């Protein structure tokens, strides 16, 4: 194990080695903020340099002052499993949360980042979209301060208000636009806990449908464009304003150099193949874009799981970095645990109560501490390989090579020369594909349930693979679905898919 001396002492661990618990008296623990967006496409951050219409100056400033990862991944191409993986630091397929419709019992048995950091004396809080069970249960997952407004417009489940005052946990009327409320809640939490280390999860429901930007933000994007695109740009502008407010609050409280910030999305944009500009802002394309990545939400192609990723820690992570080695959202928990001086794998109570030993669970993390890599101390790649399983799909990335399996189909891509996954090299390099599949099968044998896939490919995903990976024209909708779609339009919104792709 190596130690690094900064302005205050932090003890890290070389990736893969166990982290020993460190006395709080010997460790100045940094604050940690995780900012998560919802259904954000690869192209929709100004710092990515892809789309000229997106304007995110505050997020771009984080990229300029810190690190932008060009191969930053999430654990699933759908909201619930991706969030379960991020917050637990373990592949959600290990505990049976494979997709949005699955039971959450497996997640309920995990230690979240918040539970772990409470053991190290951290204040913990969250705001925004939870999507991992009823809002009233969030406190049982280690988050003491909650302002959750993922449900009905103008409503929130909260136990503190936007002035930072403690209230009885209950459904309340939220006084402002939900994205503005998230930003205000984050700032209130920072001020409330400025004198102790804290962990805050800022989970904006943007640009996920329903598309509901206020006029304040819509007016920033005049001119002809698809209305769903305008809504996406406006909602992301609200997020960006909020990030600016959070940074201002950190500076005003003298905490900027003591705070590590992660920013990413939960999965790629749902393009619905055709990017239809359906009226009403309901289920369908959210206006976001994945270009030049191939595919979309609901696929283990790059367009479904490679996300904009920023990491900022002033004075610790060198500014202006473009980091090319693959990293994954699982690494957030491992990094946080390392910085808090905790062990990355042990038997511990799920709810952080040391007296409640009957609720202990196996808690070994799947990620690695990224700080030695992001500071430049460790020049190697953080991971030998990254692995995914999502329902009927599985994938492995090892270096530049990626093997993608969807039902009976297999694809091999060289992401170094073909990040857009346009050229299937399976026939040219069968030996590489066989080796990667063997590694993938070994990993998948540890999952719950074991195996490369859980169920057959649904029709929706077959159509997505046909279009994005096999170059076939999209199939015309059947008469029943077309009728439902027309009916949905008549009500001012697109019809939802029956397989949960819109969730």
What are the functions of these language-model segments?
Residues 2, 6-10, 21-410, 417-438, ...:
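Formylglycine-dependent sulfatase
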């Amino acid at each position: 194990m190596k130690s690094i001396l900064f302005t205050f002492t932090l003890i890290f661990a070389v990736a893969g080695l166990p982290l020993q618990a460190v006395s709080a008296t010997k460790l100045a623990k940094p604050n940690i903020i995780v900012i998560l967006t919802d259904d954000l496409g690869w192209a929709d951050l100004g710092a990515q340099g892809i789309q000229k219409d997106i304007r995110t100056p505050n997020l771009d400033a984080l990229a300029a002052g810190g690190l932008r990862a060009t191969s930053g991944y999430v654990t699933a191409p759908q909201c619930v499993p991706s969030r379960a993986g991020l917050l637990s630091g373990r592949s959600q397929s290990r505990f049976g949360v494979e997709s949005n419709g699955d039971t959450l019992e497996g997640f309920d048995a995990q230690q979240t980042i918040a539970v772990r950091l409470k053991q190290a004396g951290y204040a913990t809080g969250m705001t925004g979209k939870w999507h991992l069970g009823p809002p009233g249960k969030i406190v049982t997952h280690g988050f003491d301060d909650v302002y959750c407004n993922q449900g009905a417009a103008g409503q929130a489940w909260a136990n503190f208000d936007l002035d930072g005052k403690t209230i009885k946990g209950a459904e309340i009327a939220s006084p402002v636009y939900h994205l503005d409320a998230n930003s205000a809640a984050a700032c209130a939490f920072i001020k409330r806990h400025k004198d102790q280390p804290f962990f805050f999860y800022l989970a904006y429901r943007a640009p996920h449908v329903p598309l509901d930007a206020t006029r304040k933000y819509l007016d920033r994007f005049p001119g002809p464009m698809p209305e769903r695109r305008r809504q996406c740009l406006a909602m992301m502008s609200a997020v960006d304003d909020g990030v600016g407010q959070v940074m201002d609050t950190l500076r005003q409280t003298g905490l900027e150099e003591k705070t590590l910030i992660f920013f990413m999305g939960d999965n790629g944009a749902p393009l619905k193949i055709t990017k239809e500009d359906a009226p009403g802002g309901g289920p369908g394309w959210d206006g976001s874009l994945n270009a030049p990545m191939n595919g979309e939400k609901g696929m283990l192609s790059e367009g479904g799981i490679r996300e904009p990723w920023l990491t900022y820690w002033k004075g610790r992570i060198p500014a202006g970095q473009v980091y090319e080695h693959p990293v994954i959202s699982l690494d957030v928990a491992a990094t946080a645990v390392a910085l808090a001086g905790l062990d990355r794998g042990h038997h511990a109570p799920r709810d952080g109560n040391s007296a409640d030993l009957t609720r202990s669970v196996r808690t070994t993390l799947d990620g690695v501490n990224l700080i030695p890599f992001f500071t430049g101390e460790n020049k190697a790649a953080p991971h030998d390989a990254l692995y995914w399983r999502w329902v009927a799909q599985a994938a492995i990335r090892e270096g530049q090579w990626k093997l993608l399996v969807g039902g009976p189909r297999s694809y091999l891509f060289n992401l170094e020369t073909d990040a857009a996954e346009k050229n299937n090299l399976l026939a040219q390099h069968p030996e590489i594909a066989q080796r990667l599949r063997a590694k993938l099968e070994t990993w998948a044998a540890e999952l719950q349930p074991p195996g490369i896939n859980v169920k057959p490919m649904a029709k929706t995903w077959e159509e997505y693979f046909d279009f994005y990976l096999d170059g076939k024209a999209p199939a015309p909708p059947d008469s029943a679905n077309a009728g439902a779609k027309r009916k949905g339009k008549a009500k001012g919104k697109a019809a939802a898919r029956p397989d949960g792709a819109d969730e």
